A protein has these predicted regions:
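Ser/Thr-rich, Pro/Gly/Ala-heavy low-complexity intrinsically disordered linkers and tails
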Residues: 1-169
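Short beta-strand elements bearing conserved aromatic residues within extracellular beta-rich modules
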Residues: 207-209
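Beta-propeller-forming repeat regions
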Residues: 171-179, 188-190, 197-202, 216-220, ...
Length: 767
């Protein structure tokens, strides 16, 4: 249903730098911690295990009374939240590698009186950080457009701006989640229960599981705290009555506060999905993402959808409906709707969308491309901003090749537009390499921690030839442009420069700052080109970044290209772009994935088009000849099984829905684990949304969105993948073209080691 009426915003007030503010206060759900340090006070109630300490994290030289001390033994390089004595606690997995000077403490990488590697020492020595006579809380100093060892916040221009790359300090801001308890009726009187382990939970943490039936007192189900997994199968439930499940962490033999409960209704059907009914039906094209919109520690679902088909700029068809951005609770409650209007054509290239807490208030914002005619969640319409007397820029073919374009940020709680700025300028359509809009209309967005601590917004326009990337910060209710980059391809039409139909983010070179990755091309956090394969016909649809080759240090990239050439399918070193191995292709490889799917092997297995349907090991050797998952359109991997190998989905559904399949390495074949049934549509998201560390599958039907979750008992446990910075960033790409799937910044698979604690700090209240 299209909104009609409501107030019209005719442009708002233009501030410095062309930023248009549309009013409305930014969410005030919690102050932003700059670096995670508490400047005084003692934690007197005990540190929340896995959450923020509400009484202040170990004041300088102070102690935490009743708190929990988490040093190197409670998870690789755990954070000392109970204070540090002389010499301090040594963080072996974080930014400070030498401990704290006498009586000092390390909070977010700032060493007070000690030596910080990558941080700033107040009166101490600094290696790779910004020392400006005091301590840098949360990373390099970012003030007024100058760059002190980090990212320039005022500079812009071709190639970007900024000083020398250094090692970042300071913990990354991350969502403060609840335990994400889920209960699924498996039939036969069995209920599967799963929950989250947080990124900063101590390695020794255990959990008790409780069930309250029909409102009676909760009963503990396990004999001793569960430490091997974060799931449990309840074989004694009376499913004819309602059952509320919760968990309670156990640390050092002491039970902590209980989680929020998940209630399985009486006579709940034996199905392994949550149903989110669409406010109105007719879904034809959809993509989805998740974020904690209201700061309650639970993910909400943001669905971008249309009754029109998914229009590709290269094979244009006229959109028959506008695109909606709907927000829902996972219990199906509708929250709000943004109608993007007729100037945003129906299709993933036209409507990039992000869901992320970009201002550090503990609540996710929704960020998308908009134009005149867009209606926000409170009914306010963007009006005639340029005074040309029109707000509909469709031509006779239904294409939109002119008119104002914006990036808008919406408040997660109600969809109110908080602020907007101009999108990357279209200029002349032919600047991008054609006259039809195929290239100028291909647009992407992402989130990257360019200073190593705070999320920045990345917007990108153009593939094939001319490409422009910009970086923005949204802090304190204002947008500021950090830098702009372009590849110098303006007006070129024949060449395919290094590019991809998707973006990925990650710390490619290990300096603590994120890079922006475009397949055969990487941009440094400063906005400079980090490396470029400088390929002719260098464009591809998919690529993936992770620890794909465990024997090597650092990250690798598996990428594919669209045109016949040597190394058209290749593994690269993410820090340098060096080709580690490659395969010659005779045409468009179309798709490609790299993930650990064969439990007999170690590292990633790789599959793609144009390589004879072979399955390759991480080093390029063929391990299954002509029978890879690519045969029969089995593509996107998902963590679904009990162990650490990934299963494989049908990315595109057939008549009987989306399948999840287990790969059998010995026979080079697939075994079906689950199928979603007839009428289901294309996969929208694969991410760790609920329960334990394994992933959920989000798919669409004409009238509902379904969130499928595994009920296979786990054989091990990990902290939630959403607390791994690189995984979380790349899940953020899921409501865009060729989202693929995400990988953490550690090796996850057969023969893995316990992953180090992530270098994060929670933003928002504990849950």
């Amino acid at each position: 249903m299209t909104r009609t009426g409501g107030a019209t915003d005719a442009g708002g007030t233009i501030g410095a730098g062309g930023v248009i503010s549309t009013g409305g206060a930014t969410g005030t759900g919690g102050a932003t911690a700059t670096g995670g340090s508490a400047t005084g006070g003692t934690a007197t109630g005990g540190a929340r295990i896995g959450g923020a300490t509400t009484g202040g994290v170990a004041a300088t030289g102070g102690t935490a009374t009743g708190g929990v001390i988490r040093t190197g033994g409670t998870g690789a390089g755990g954070v000392a939240t109970g204070g540090a004595g002389a010499g301090g606690a040594t963080r072996t997995g974080g930014a400070n590698t030498g401990g704290v000077g006498a009586g000092g403490s390390v909070t977010g990488g700032a060493g007070v009186g000690g030596a910080a590697t990558g941080g700033a020492g107040a009166g101490g020595s600094v290696t790779g950080g910004a020392a400006t006579g005091g301590s840098a809380t949360g990373g390099a100093t970012r003030t007024g457009g100058t760059n002190t060892g980090g990212v320039a916040t005022g500079g812009a221009g071709t190639g970007g701006a900024g000083g020398a790359s250094t090692v970042a300090s300071g913990k990354r801001e991350m969502e403060s989640l609840d335990r994400g308890v889920i209960a699924i009726n498996q039939g036969g009187g069995k209920v599967y229960v799963g929950w989250r382990m947080f990124g900063l939970d101590p390695g020794s943490i255990g959990f008790n599981v409780y069930r309250a039936t029909a409102g009676a007192a909760a009963v503990k189900l396990n004999a001793s705290p569960i430490t091997a997994t974060t799931d449990y199968v309840d074989s004694g439930a009376d499913v004819t009555k309602s059952n509320a499940y919760h968990v309670a962490p156990v640390v050092g033999g002491v039970e902590q506060d209980a989680s929020a409960a998940y209630t399985l209704p009486a006579n709940a059907p034996a199905q392994q999905y949550l149903s989110v009914p669409l406010r109105d039906g007719g879904l034809n094209y959809a993509q989805a993402n998740v974020g904690d919109l209201d700061g309650d520690g639970q993910y909400e679902l943001v669905v971008k959808w249309s009754k029109s088909a998914n229009v590709d700029p290269g094979s244009h068809t006229t959109a028959t409906a506008t695109v909606y951005v709907d927000a829902y609770k996972l219990d199906g409650s509708f929250l709000w709707r943004v109608d993007l209007g007729w100037n945003l054509e129906s299709g993933s290239d036209f409507t990039p969308l992000l869901v992320y807490d970009v201002d550090g208030d503990g609540k996710a914002e929704v960020i998308t491309k908009t134009s005149e005619g867009t209606i926000d969640g409170t009914g306010v319409t963007i009006g005639d901003t340029d005074g040309d007397g029109k707000t509909d820029y469709r031509n006779s073919d239904g294409r939109v090749l002119s008119g104002p374009e914006f990036m808008s940020i919406y408040r997660g709680t109600d969809g109110k537009e908080l602020i907007r700025t101009n999108w990357i300028a279209r200029g002349s359509v032919s600047d991008w390499g054609d006259s039809t809009g195929n290239r100028s209309c291909r647009q992407q967005m992402g989130i990257a921690y360019l200073d190593g601590a705070h999320p920045s917004i990345i917007m990108s326009r153009g593939v094939y030839a001319y490409q422009v990337v910009q970086a923005w910060d949204y802090r304190g209710g204002a947008l500021s442009k950090l830098w702009a980059w372009d590849n110098g391809g303006k007006g070129q039409s024949g060449e395919w420069y290094s590019s991809a139909q998707c973006l990925r983010m990650g710390d490619a070179n290990g300096d603590g700052y994120d890079e922006i990755l475009k397949g055969p091309l990487a941009l440094d956090h400063t906005g400079k080109t980090l490396w470029d394969e400088k390929l002719i016909k260098g464009h591809g649809d998919y690529f993936h970044i992770g620890i794909l080759t465990p024997a090597r240090s650092g990250l690798q990239i598996f990428r594919i290209l669209e045109a016949a050439q040597d190394n058209g399918v290749a593994m690269l070193d993410a820090a340098t772009g060096t080709v580690l191995w490659g395969k010659t292709i005779a045409g468009d490889a179309s798709r490609g994935y790299a993930s650990h799917i064969d439990s007999r092997q170690k590292g990633a297995q790789c599959w793609a088009g144009q390589i004879n349907d072979d399955l390759l090991n991480y080093d390029g050797t063929v391990i299954c000849n002509g029978t890879s998952p690519s045969k029969g359109d089995h593509w996107a991997p998902i963590w679904w099984e009990g162990g650490f190998t990934r299963s494989i989905t049908d990315e595109f559904s057939g008549n009987d829905g989306v399948h999840i399949n287990q790969w059998n390495g010995a026979s080079c074949s697939l075994t079906e684990l689950m199928k979603t049934g007839s009428g289901t549509r294309i996969t929208q998201t694969i991410a760790d949304i609920l329960g334990d560390w394994r992933e959920e599958l989000v798919i669409g039907l004409p009238n509902e969105i379904r969130v499928y979750t595994t009920t296979i008992p786990a054989t091990g446990r990990l902290y939630t993948l959403m607390h791994n910075p690189m995984y979380r960033l790349n899940v953020g790409q899921s409501a865009q073209r060729n989202f693929g799937t995400s990988l953490p910044d550690y090796y996850l698979g057969t023969g893995m080691s316990t992953p180090p604690a992530p270098d994060i700090k929670y933003v928002g209240p504990p849950h």
